């Protein structure tokens, strides 16, 4: 398996001129920053079904019976729904263990949410839909991190997506190297604090499931369920409250090493973060400093401190 996470991506977001108007929607963050740390598998579903660029615009039509169809806006009876469905059904199972997918917002083929729906007379309806290709993607791999370009401008959603793709890549790598009970338990142990920061109830629910590993004869079957549970927890953006609980938990590991001044400083930094006066990077940096000075075997394994490459600097923007 590649040492880099592999992401599927709508081709237009990489700068490829494949849009219906012959243009593109190149994403600066993805191509100028994230691209250093991941590999891409490009796809333009509309070109993949044989359409040229430029081409007439497509739209999603909701029929009287409630079915969603993909048709040309200028020729509403020219239907390409089945071509798109067939392409997705043939393409998705063959592209390997992706760590995530970035799709083009509002596209009738790739949009993840709020895609315009029209009635059969060409009038815009009240409801909104999902692009046909992305709908198939979400159905095929419900645990896969999927985001669209517009949402990735939000610092919290961006950080959450990147965190998830690196977690899934690590899990995929674990499986590729051969599953063992020890490896699965070690993986979960390294992600405990990270899971706690995302969803306390999910953290408490997944613990007993992992503890039941000895009852599973089929490790691959266990992996499939664990993957679904892990990614569901990480999909919930970590809250300031949950981060504070984790930071205070970590603080307790240094109670015997720090003097009164150091303990007070650390407590104040965590409280300032909790109250929105400092970004999460402030208490994390101080805790990492103390961890380097007073190594703890358990804390040193925790992925919470470095869930993705520091050079992406995503925590600078997360308050």
Predicted segment positions?
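Acidic, Ser/Pro/Thr-rich low-complexity regulatory regions
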Residues: 146-319
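Short beta-strand segments
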Residues: 10-11, 44, 102-106
């Amino acid at each position: 398996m590649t040492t880099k996470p592999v992401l599927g991506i709508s081709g237009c977001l990489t700068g490829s001129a494949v849009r219906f108007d012959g243009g593109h929607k190149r994403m600066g963050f993805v191509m100028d920053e994230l691209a250093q740390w991941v590999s891409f598998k490009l796809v333009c579903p509309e070109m993949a079904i044989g359409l040229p660029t430029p081409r007439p615009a497509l739209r999603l039509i909701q029929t009287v019976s409630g079915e969603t169809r993909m048709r040309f806006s200028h020729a509403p009876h020219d239907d390409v729904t089945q071509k798109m469905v067939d392409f997705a059904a043939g393409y998705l199972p063959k592209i390997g263990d992706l760590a995530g997918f970035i799709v083009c917002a509002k596209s009738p083929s790739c949009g993840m949410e709020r895609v315009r729906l029209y009635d059969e007379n060409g009038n815009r309806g009240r409801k909104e839909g999902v692009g046909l290709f992305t709908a198939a993607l979400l159905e095929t791999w419900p645990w896969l991190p999927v985001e669209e370009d517009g949402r990735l401008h939000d610092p919290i959603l961006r950080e959450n997506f990147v965190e998830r793709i690196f977690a899934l890549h690590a899990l995929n790598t674990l499986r590729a190297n051969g599953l063992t009970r020890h490896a699965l338990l070690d993986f979960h142990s390294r992600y405990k604090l990270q899971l706690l920061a995302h969803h306390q109830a999910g953290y408490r629910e997944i613990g007993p499931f992992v503890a039941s590993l000895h009852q599973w004869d089929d490790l691959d079957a266990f992996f499939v369920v664990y993957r679904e549970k892990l990614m569901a927890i990480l999909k919930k953006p970590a809250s300031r409250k949950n981060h504070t609980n984790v930071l205070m938990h970590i603080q307790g590991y240094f109670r015997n090493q720090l003097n009164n001044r150091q303990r007070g400083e650390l407590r104040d930094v965590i409280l300032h973060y909790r109250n929105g006066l400092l970004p999460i990077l402030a208490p994390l940096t101080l805790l990492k400093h103390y961890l380097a000075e007073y190594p703890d075997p358990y804390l040193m394994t925790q992925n919470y401190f470095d869930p993705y490459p520091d050079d992406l600097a995503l925590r600078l923007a997360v308050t």
